Amino acid sequence: MNVLVIGKSPETLEKVKAGLRAKGIVAHGTTEIEKASVNFDAKDFALVAFGGGVPIPVCEKLKSEFRQQNPDVILLDTFAPIAVQHIAAALRGDLDKREFGSRFEVTRHEGSYIVRLDVMKEGDVRVEAYHLGDRLHAETILEQHIPSGPFEARIHESKIHRGLNMILVTLGGSEFYFHRIERN
């Protein structure tokens, strides 16, 4: 299957493409974000992945243009630390087969970001905060085994920096939930 990865950083893009190729996935990529739907046709791809550094308005415009080119193409928001696993799971159809969690949301409340998730099956959870500054910074907020039922984690606002941030929740080592926060 052919995949197109759209990202901001040439180095990161090459690492993601190499990881996909190691899994037997034909991977193409571009850092010419604004021209992606002109330079590539979604009919040539099973999946188009958008990296976390792609600005939201540009991402939405590209998704619309790619959807017009190929209504069946999978359009996936992802980011570097999980991109290879995330893309491979999407190609297998695993993203629709959530085994561990459902209803994921992140809200802001009294100086913190609250992560809420309905856990359907007990397992391990890891909550991480990523920040893209001069390089990608990661901090594990919480890592533990949890029972089924409602799950909540609090991320203090001091962990969220100026610029692009991602909150990543991994359930059972294989299900990914993430939320993008851009702070000025």
Where would I find each of the regions flagged by the language model?
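Conserved acidic segment of CheY-like receiver
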Residues: M1-P10, V48
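Short hydrophobic/Thr-rich beta-strand motif most characteristic of the beta2 strand and flanking loop
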Residues: I25-E32
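Short alpha-helical segment
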Residues: K35-S37
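Conserved phosphotransfer microenvironments
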Residues: F50-E65
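Ser/Thr/Gly-rich flexible loops in soluble cytosolic domains mediating phosphotransfer, phosphorylation
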Residues: E65-G101
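Aromatic/hydrophobic beta-strand junction motif of beta-rich domains
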Residues: G111-E122, A129
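Solvent-exposed serine/threonine-rich low-complexity stretches and specific carbohydrate-binding patches
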Residues: L132-F151
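Short, aromatic- and glycine-rich surface loops/edge beta-strands on solvent-exposed regions
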Residues: I155, H161-E175
